[in-house]
């Protein structure tokens, strides 16, 4: 898929980041993963992100990523697959090339590993990744990797295949300046944990869409919220926030890392053999899984 096509796909609907399925011993469970991807693709997600943040990119070996991308492509049908990429310049370029070879339609460049870096260094890293592939690339502002407006503008000029910007900082002033400055040069994706909690603010700041983590296990509910948001149906949005998203947030906030672990628990509760999270994350307790099971309620498949 060429960069313009993936840009169009990214902006055409609700997106999600499937969890990566593991066997009990930690190995990638390709069959269960493909079953899950096929189920999600049936809800007309235009793009799914393989080996992204919710997919435990940070705990994957670079050598595992092409197999995950390939499995996602096999099961996704018409749904495009964007692969996670990151760590640093050398490893990042290797991952980018391998993901493209495995069939990825685009890349999401996650924050680099550990260290704070100046804007010039961030510019160089993003440019190296973009230059290494022919597919579209989306950058992710979060934690120690926050591109400023001028840096992002330079990258837009230097990298024709830079097609998207995802924000996980919550800095609405910065993201509004970015959308006002870059306009339709990029597609804009809200990427805060449990993005539905912030979706109205981000759409008001000029963002195109967002990625829904809960789409992993309650895709029908996630789509209902998205459609209500797009239609300006505030009563429905508020009902779903009260009845599902705020109670889910309470479970998610019980321990660090539950933004991923709670999603994977939801996938298991829907009958998929998603397996455990990898260290350093930890799974929900039996009590917490019961709370989540009750919350899913009528949204069981």
UniProtKB/Swiss-Prot annotation:
Q: Which domain of life is it from?
A: Bacteria
E.C. numbers: 4.2.1.41
Q: Which UniProt keywords apply?
A: Lyase
What enzyme class is recorded for this protein?
lyase
Reaction(s) catalyzed by this protein? 5-dehydro-4-deoxy-D-glucarate + H(+) = 2,5-dioxopentanoate + CO2 + H2O
Show the InterPro entries listed in the entry. Answer: Aldolase_TIM, DapA-like, Dehydro-deoxyglucarate_dehyd
Name the Gene Ontology molecular function terms of this record: 4-hydroxy-tetrahydrodipicolinate synthase activity; 5-dehydro-4-deoxyglucarate dehydratase activity
Q: In which pathway does it act?
A: Carbohydrate acid metabolism; D-glucarate degradation; 2,5-dioxopentanoate from D-glucarate: step 2/2
GO BP: any one term: D-glucarate catabolic process
Q: Which family does it belong to?
A: Belongs to the DapA family.
Protein name per Swiss-Prot or TrEMBL: Probable 5-dehydro-4-deoxyglucarate dehydratase
